[in-house]
Amino acid sequence: MVIQRKYRASRRLGVNLWGRSKDPFNTRNYPPGQHGGMGYKKPSDFGKQFAAHKKFKFYYAINSKQMRNIFLKAYKKRGDTGDNFVGLLESRLSSVLYNSGLVPTIFSARQLISHKHVLVNGKTVNISSYVVKVGDVVTLKEKAKNLPAVVFAVQSQEQKVPDYLEVDTQEKSIRYLRVPKYCEVPYPATMEVNLVIEFYSR
């Protein structure tokens, strides 16, 4: 059900959000539902802002309250709000694990974390929103290294690993090298952080 909802989100937003080869949007590039075949309507300015906000929300698998809190933290920090916002999202444990390519989806990353299969600096962490710091090492526990989802993800190499992560596919370990800026994140779809800022600044 989670995977189905994820794919439905891609079709609703009109984009292959996670860049996966099996995303149904690749073959059914119209909205879901009874009238989906009529195609996508041209959105208003607010509609564009709302859609941009939804893309980030679905991509990182977070809820509206979490998203708003992350934005407020980014807004209060020094520096560029967009870079701060993306940096906070990318520093979440679930994001680091997903971006490493050791798991196939953000949802499988969250599941491994909640089932206590993930270590940060040798200690078990079961909270997806845990903030990984620069220099931290994330590893999978021994019993998780041969899980079908992990083996599939490593073999398929479908995920493009960003250069701010150092990944050892043999040891199933990840070192967080630095907090990325918005322009450094290899999003598979167009992600407009400026529209998210506008959405929350209304």
Swiss-Prot record:
Keywords: Ribonucleoprotein, Ribosomal protein, RNA-binding, rRNA-binding
Gene Ontology process terms (BP): ribosomal small subunit biogenesis; translation
Keyword rRNA-binding carried by entry: yes
Superkingdom of the source species: Bacteria
Signal sequence extent: none
Listed InterPro entries: Ribosomal_uS4, Ribosomal_uS4_bac-type, Ribosomal_uS4_N, S4_RNA-bd, S4_RNA-bd_sf
MF-aspect GO terms: rRNA binding; structural constituent of ribosome
Any Gene Ontology CC annotation: small ribosomal subunit
S4 RNA-binding domain ranges (all copies): 91-168
Function: One of the primary rRNA binding proteins, it binds directly to 16S rRNA where it nucleates assembly of the body of the 30S subunit.
Family indicated by similarity: Belongs to the universal ribosomal protein uS4 family.
Quaternary state and interactors: Part of the 30S ribosomal subunit. Contacts protein S5. The interaction surface between S4 and S5 is involved in control of translational fidelity.
Name of the molecule in the record: Small ribosomal subunit protein uS4
Species for this entry: Ehrlichia chaffeensis (strain ATCC CRL-10679 / Arkansas)
Gene, per the UniProt record: rpsD
